[in-house]
Design a protein with these regions (language model features):
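Select transmembrane alpha-helical segments in multipass membrane proteins
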Residues: 9-20, 45, 81-95, 124-129, ...
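Selective recognition of specific alpha-helical transmembrane segments in multi-pass small-molecule
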Residues: 57, 61, 155-167, 231-256, ...
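Hydrophobic, membrane-embedded alpha-helices of multi-pass small-molecule transporters
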Residues: 15-25, 166-173, 182-248, 284-293, ...
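Membrane-water interface regions at transmembrane-helix termini and the short interhelical loops
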Residues: 67-74, 131-152, 217-220, 329-342, ...
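Hydrophobic transmembrane alpha-helices that form the core helical bundles
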Residues: 35, 69, 82-117, 293-310, ...
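Membrane-interface loop-to-helix entry segments
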Residues: 138-167, 343-355, 374-382
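Hydrophobic alpha-helical segments and their helix-loop junctions in multi-pass secondary transporters
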Residues: 97, 101, 157-184, 201-202, ...
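TM-loop-TM module centered on a large, flexible mid-protein loop between adjacent transmembrane helices
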Residues: 73-80, 244-294, 301, 310, ...
Length: 424
């Protein structure tokens, strides 16, 4: 039977789902949907369907794939053990301390500058408090359901609902604006492209181990029950993302019509919050960004710390978490631009590989032959790595492949590799 006595249900399931949602929902997740709404205008809901497929469907599939495989190293290990170690290290570093963790502090501080002003000292003090608090919350990764799921996630949802309610009760415009050319032509396709840019499927690969720890902490210890609980929590988080993204997309559609010319999602939200509530709106929006960024920061520190503690068991988890929190604080203040110039191309190179790992995991077992895994990943990497990193003439050739202009040049090689693996 699938439902054992240890099945994760009821309030415990909701808490774990809330925790996973709060780990996913960072600054980028706040910014992308409103900007889509502002740009898509009257084509907003068609674009939103496409956005949901790639911005929600892919990450939740990633959570399920990692749960089914028993962790990211096990999933990537279906290709080769050495590949698994290299790939996992790249994923954890590039989306953790080399990109997303330092950006949680710098982005949330940006939203505070209209209220507190901009200064180097102010940013340093903010990041010091931010990362110190995040470190202490992440110090007990198995307790995140109590800290994120029970407290911070509900607080974040309440603030977003207040902003949405203000938009409904005092709409700044009577309807949505005129869609830009890309959304007018193929709104759903453009929405898929926008959702792909969130790269949340990589975050999904990161979070599996910490979610499993939190499920075990509520008394679920059977391996199969933990896997099923992780997948169910992923579905809860996906449903929450769908509802919150829909609210933010509507907010963006109204804001785009009332305040045209905003060139970022943050500007779209700022214009509407200020128009609805004045200075109180600025405080509301800053609080939303700070809580969302803090939740993601905690989740990433815990995930990266757990992975490297397993990889290097001689180093304690608290020491590893402290190291990455300190490293992220320094990067947020002195070296973020330089590290982004390296980590973003690496992310672009490995993201298609992550998607192929997720996709092959869901193939029927009789098709999951070693060659399918290896050739699928190899052919994907042969396109994605030269396209993302400077490889001279080879990069030019790879960027000439079908769908390269849309960021999907890896898709045809991946399908060819999987096809060859199935035939041989």
């Amino acid at each position: 039977m699938h439902d054992s006595a240890q099945a994760l249900r009821g309030k415990k399931l909701l808490l774990v789902g809330f925790t996973l949602f709060s780990m996913f929902f960072g600054a980028g997740n706040l910014i992308f949907p409103p900007f889509l709404g502002a740009q898509a205008g009257t084509a907003l809901w068609s674009a939103f369907v496409g956005f949901a497929v790639s911005a929600i469907g892919l990450p939740i599939a990633g959570v399920a794939a990692v749960a089914r495989a028993g962790g990211l190293p096990a999933l990537a290990g279906r290709v080769h053990p050495r590949f698994a170690q290299v790939f996992a290290v790249l994923v954890y570093l590039s989306i953790g301390p080399c990109l997303a963790i330092p950006r949680t502090a710098s982005t949330s501080f940006e939203m505070l500058t209209p209220l507190v002003g901009r200064s180097t000292l102010g940013q340093f003090l903010y990041s010091l408090v931010f990362f110190t608090a995040a470190y202490f919350v992440a110090l007990r990764p198995e307790k995140l359901t109590q800290r994120l799921g029970r407290i911070l996630c509900p607080a974040l949802l309440v603030l977003i609902v207040v902003l949405f309610a203000g938009c409904l009760l005092r709409p700044a415009a009577s309807g949505y604006g005129v869609p830009t050319a890309a959304y007018a032509a193929l709104p759903a396709a453009q929405g898929i492209l926008d959702g792909y840019q969130t790269m949340d499927a990589l975050a999904a690969l990161n979070f599996g181990a910490v979610i499993a720890l939190n499920i075990q902490a509520v008394g679920i210890t059977e391996e199969a029950a933990v896997r099923r609980g992780t997948i169910r929590a992923g579905l809860i988080a996906g449903g929450m993302l769908l509802v919150v993204y829909a609210m933010l997309t509507h907010i963006g559609g109204i804001s785009g019509a009332a305040f045209p010319g905003c060139d970022t999602g943050a500007a779209v939200l700022t214009a509407l919050a200020d128009g609805l509530f004045g200075r109180v709106g600025q405080v509301l929006l800053a609080a939303i960004f700070v809580i969302a960024c803090f939740n993601t920061c905690v989740g990433l520190i815990a995930s990266v710390g757990e992975y490297f503690h397993e990889l290097l068991p001689r180093l304690s988890y608290p020491a590893i978490a402290a190291f990455f929190a300190l490293m992220s604080m320094l990067l947020a203040n002195i070296g973020l631009a330089d590290i982004l110039s390296l980590s973003v191309p690496v992310l672009n190179a490995i993201y298609p590989i992550a998607i192929i790992l997720i996709a092959v995991e869901f193939l029927p077992e009789r098709f999951q032959r070693p060659l399918v895994w290896r050739l699928g990943v190899l052919f994907t990497a042969l396109q994605s790595i030269p396209s993302a990193l400077p490889f001279g003439p080879l990069s030019g050739f790879m960027n000439a492949l079908p769908l390269s202009g849309l960021g999907f040049g890896w898709l045809l090689p991946a399908l060819i590799g999987i096809g060859i693996g199935l035939v041989l």
